[in-house]
Amino acid sequence: MKNKIGTMILAAAAVAATGAFAKDDAEAALKARLPGIFAKAAAHYRALDAAATPLMKGKVAKMVEGKSDLYVPHGWKDNAGRLDMRSIFWWTSGNFPGSLWYLYKATGDEFFKSRALAWTSILAPNSKVTTSHDFAYVMNCSFGNAKRILGTDRYDALLAETAETLAKRYDSRLGLIRSWGPIGDKKHFLVIPDNLMLLELLEVVSKLPGGDRRFDEVARSHADMTMKHHFRADGGARHVVDYDQKTLRVQEIRRGQGASCETAWARGQAWAMYGYTMMYRETGDKRYFDFACKLSDYAIGHPNMPSDGVPYWDFGAPGEERDSSAAAVMASALLELSGFAGGEKGAKYRAFAVKQLTTLSSPEYFSEGGEIGHFLLKHGVEHKPAGLKIDTPLDYGDYYYLEALLRFRAMAR
């Protein structure tokens, strides 16, 4: 009996050791590849910048947010074989400049600093936009990264102005920031989990010298109310929740960009994982850490999560298109969360993120040439129900992929 128990203990130890070695091997392999990955990414973005710069100025585009003749690359039009340029008021217009900032951080090449400054500067009008929540995301990815990476206070006033503008979309009765629609809309008050990504700007501004702590209160309130109404008991995220402004209750749940109200849109789940991890970093409130873990456990433990870590565009749509952008956001969130968790839980999150980054860095997902306009990641899905940008590169996919690689590099040193 003793020999049998001893054999079982040794076998268990061997299995554990094998798992540890596999994890170490995967991390070592990715770490060894990092210089080459960053070099390829830099070459791609030099070419992308060269192609996009002549297209920066074009016809005046009229959007709800305003008029502008300035454009930023968003993706690649496969059918037309050309860049998809969007107005500076487009919700992802900060991601391309943000990727340039990350490449400057990754390589130290002054070229990327110069180009990041050029593309960032044209986005300043977003600080005054009141017609949606997206402008704050634009400003944080561009000017926010300029502040963080350059270590300057030059952009503090602009970021503070953006926070003030965003706060105008906050309803203190509901405790939420309106995502879509005009501030005066009495019929609908739409909120999406993507909104959590804006809270970082509020937290950063609240901590500036002389910063207004009201922004921290708004961010916490929005995070708390989103936690209460936007997720099922199993941790799956709902995309669109519409609130009644008279009763202060949920009046409708919509599938939005997801397959249905009872599944979880993969990128929406990723936004939420990222948002609550960030809120824990900024506030130290353990409720946000615990919730980030719950959301992450739902994603990485879902029976429909593919073995390579790149999710289908919706967790309820197995066998359909994968979404590389969702994987990139998840990987970045999981790496940060792993550092907070530590122990076995942290090791689990880190290992899954490494698997995702390894997959995204493979020829299946990483573009080796200019076939997708020199963007990095293939196979992104923006809005499947609407038939928009399916199986294509996406600017925010590249942005979070680079961010995740930088986080991994910092942890692996």
Model-flagged regions — what are they?
Residues 1-9:
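Bacterial N-terminal signal peptides that target proteins for export
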Residues 6, 21-22:
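Intrinsically disordered, low-complexity serine/threonine-rich segments
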Residues 8-17:
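Bacterial N-terminal signal peptides
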Residues 22-413:
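Glycan-recognition and catalytic cores of secretory/periplasmic carbohydrate-active enzymes
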